[in-house]
């Protein structure tokens, strides 16, 4: 298939097929590996996997040697150790096409915590390929010391958690958290916070209503007690004095006083 075969240059002569297979692990299914002395070929089932391998593995170390990875071409290129091969499978896609293509996003997302600031997204992606096929990786965005890795399958995600959680990258042990679980935790926390706030609001409202009803009942009882005290209060002294004076000036008392004064005047006349 056109575009599925890649060339490995500057290959260590001691490299075996297992070493090459391990080197390309996580980049898709491999159909064939053909090793020569100092170079070799790897054929993928999907040309997109070949593009990923060329873009991301060129210049990496394989068996203590920095190898060159590029698409297999029909014409020979001398002067750089590749003039001895010719391949009938030629790549029609330029090498820079993959850089402009958007990454494949999936729901099989891992959150990487405690990530060293020296680790780039490329380093993180290369590290996570030990567990499976990585489709997307990012580092320190939007949060520093935190990365995101997405896998092609959920099985690769679980494999990464089991094998790579707690491993060191640049001197720091990383912690892997499944993205869906972390999202659900944040949702549950926000829901509990809203519930507690609504409960506190309802409690404060009920308390204010109770205090308001109590104050109203107290004011009503006070007004009732005042009205009762006013109705039961004794007659003031002035009114009592007025009543006594009016009683002393009754007609019977006036007649008695007149009769007494007459009897006194008669006794005085008889004495004279």
UniProtKB/Swiss-Prot annotation:
The keyword Manganese does not apply. Residues 74-83, 182-229 have a biased composition (Basic residues). GO terms for biological process: cellular response to insulin stimulus; liver regeneration; mRNA processing; mRNA splice site recognition; mRNA splicing, via spliceosome; positive regulation of RNA splicing. Residues 242-254 have a biased composition (Low complexity). The modification N6-acetyllysine is found at residue 167. Belongs to the splicing factor SR family. This is Serine/arginine-rich splicing factor 5. The gene is SRSF5. Plays a role in constitutive splicing and can modulate the selection of alternative splice sites. Keywords: Acetylation, mRNA processing, mRNA splicing, Nucleus, Phosphoprotein, Repeat, RNA-binding. SUPFAM superfamilies: RNA-binding domain, RBD. One of its GO terms (cellular component) is nucleoplasm. It holds the Pfam family RRM_1. Extensively phosphorylated on serine residues in the RS domain. It is found in: Nucleus. The modification Phosphoserine is found at residues 86, 227, 229, 233, 250, 253. GO terms for molecular function: protein kinase B binding; RNA binding. Interacts (via RS domain) with PHF5A (via N-terminus). Found in a pre-mRNA splicing complex with SRSF4/SFRS4, SRSF5/SFRS5, SNRNP70, SNRPA1, SRRM1 and SRRM2. Gene3D superfamilies: 3.30.70.330. It comes from Homo sapiens. Residues 73-105, 174-272 are annotated as: Disordered. InterPro entries: Nucleotide-bd_a/b_plait_sf (IPR012677), RBD_domain_sf (IPR035979), RRM_dom (IPR000504), RRT5_SRSF_SR (IPR050374). Residues 4-74, 108-181 form the RRM domain.
